[in-house]
């Protein structure tokens, strides 16, 4: 029992380290609990700061599920204990003791925990998320669909009924955290993820300097994902007025120099009438 409690505590405490809040504070981004969807998770950070920060938070959140589960497996814990350790990590992410119990929705942490628990299950859940997000462009719908299927994937691939309850509890918690998204989906008010390419292409794209764009009610969205050709055209448009001014100045300077260099007239002065007389 002491071993079980130890792993549960480790999972919960690691899950309580909210990477979304830490990343936003480190890089000077708005507090994800107060801006955007007010959810301290990867999707909201992507909205607030761009793709590079969203992916960073997603990776850290996944590690919070991966590390405690790997630790439990290294300590030769039973599969059901490992599954409860994964549950503890997800609960820690949702209700972190270090951040006044205001956490995220646990999707990335759940996928990370499943990857460490059973790699194929984790891959299937992640693939489900990517496919749903790619076709319907709703992050919440992708999360609901993929996590809901996780317990049934485990039954098919593992066949151990003992691990079904903790995985099913994770599903219930994730669905509860998405209750507002579920209502907005029904009403047709849920914001879509908006990318220039498919979701898979955006995630696989190597350049970290390109920001993602997402629609959100009441928020102005600036598209920073501009092609290089467009950037070049904008730069040239800015430089053209400066070039014209420089040319005008050069012409004025040249005309002054030419005027200064012209020899003075050497024509003799005409004598007055009196001198002639």
Curated annotation (Swiss-Prot):
GO cellular component: plasma membrane
Family affiliation: Belongs to the PlsY family.
Protein's pathway: Lipid metabolism; phospholipid metabolism
Enzyme's top EC category: transferase
Classification of source organism: Bacteria, Pseudomonadati, Pseudomonadota, Gammaproteobacteria, Legionellales
Residue ranges, annotated region (Disordered): 231-277
Name assigned to this protein: Glycerol-3-phosphate acyltransferase
GO biological process: phospholipid biosynthetic process
């Amino acid at each position: 029992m002491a071993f079980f409690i130890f792993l549960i505590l480790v999972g919960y405490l690691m899950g309580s380290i909210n990477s979304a809040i830490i990343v936003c504070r480190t890089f000077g981004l708005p507090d994800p609990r107060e801006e955007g969807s007010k959810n301290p998770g990867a999707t909201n950070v992507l909205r607030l700061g761009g793709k590079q920060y969203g992916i960073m938070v997603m990776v850290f959140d996944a590690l919070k599920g991966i590390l405690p589960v790997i630790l439990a497996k290294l300590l030769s814990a039973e599969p059901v204990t490992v599954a409860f350790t994964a549950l503890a990590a997800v609960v820690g992410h949702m209700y972190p003791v270090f951040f006044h119990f205001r956490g995220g929705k646990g999707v990335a942490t759940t996928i990370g925990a499943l990857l460490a628990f059973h790699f194929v299950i984790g891959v299937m859940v992640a693939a489900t998320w990517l496919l749903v997000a790619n076709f319907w462009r709703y992050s919440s719908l992708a999360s609901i669909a993929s996590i809901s299927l996780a317990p049934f994937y485990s039954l098919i691939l593992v066949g151990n009924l003992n691990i079904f309850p903790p995985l099913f509890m994770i599903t219930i918690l994730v669905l509860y955290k998405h209750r507002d998204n579920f209502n907005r989906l029904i009403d047709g008010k849920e914001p879509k993820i908006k990318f220039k390419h498919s979701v898979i292409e955006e995630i696989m794209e190597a350049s970290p300097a390109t920001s993602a764009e997402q629609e959100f009610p009441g928020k102005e969205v600036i598209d920073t994902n501009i092609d290089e050709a467009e950037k070049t055209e904008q730069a040239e448009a800015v430089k053209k007025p400066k070039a014209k001014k420089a040319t005008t100045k050069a012409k004025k300077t040249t005309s002054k120099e030419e005027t200064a260099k012209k020899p003075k007239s050497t024509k003799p002065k005409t004598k007055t009438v009196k001198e002639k007389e």
